[in-house]
């Protein structure tokens, strides 16, 4: 099995992915999370596993990211500010995490030839009449002058 990087690995989805990869026999997993919206309690059950390395830090604060990632095979980039309320209350931090940190991860992974899986939010779909979405579903995306649509 491969060696994985999971940014945002202490969040709900990230921590679930960490546990699934461990169950499938991952050789090692590097979790990078600043715990701004994730929680150490989500990964507490795996922190003593010798295959886990946890770095409690903002991605943009890691100076040696290129060399840190160099021995890994695949990156799941899940780190992001989540929730409209959180984004509105932490605009600068959200921009740093959602844009600059993503850029830094992509550059480091490119420098090390590491494939990356990028994730997004359901917010990109806007609003639709039905709860079930298909590729043909018509959606409404509002103006960015309204806080609800600005992130």
Show where each model-derived region lies:
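N-terminal Rossmann-like NAD(P)+-binding domain of SDR-like oxidoreductases, especially those catalyzing
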Residues: 1-151
């Amino acid at each position: 099995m491969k060696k994985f990087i999971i940014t945002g690995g202490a969040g709900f989805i990230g921590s679930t992915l960490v546990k699934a990869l461990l169950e499938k026999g991952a050789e090692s997993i590097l979790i990078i999370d600043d715990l701004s919206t994730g929680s150490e309690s989500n990964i507490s059950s795996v922190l003593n596993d010798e295959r886990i390395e946890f770095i409690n830090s903002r991605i943009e604060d890691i100076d040696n990211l290129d060399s840190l990632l160099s021995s890994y095979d695949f990156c799941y980039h899940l780190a992001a500010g989540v929730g409209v309320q959180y984004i509105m209350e932490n605009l600068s931090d959200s921009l740093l995490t959602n844009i600059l940190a993503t850029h830094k991860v992509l550059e480091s992974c490119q420098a090390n030839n590491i494939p990356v899986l990028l994730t997004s939010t359901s917010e990109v779909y806007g609003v639709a009449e039905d709860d079930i979405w298909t590729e043909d579903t018509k959606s409404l995306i509002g103006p960015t002058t309204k806080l609800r649509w600005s992130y």
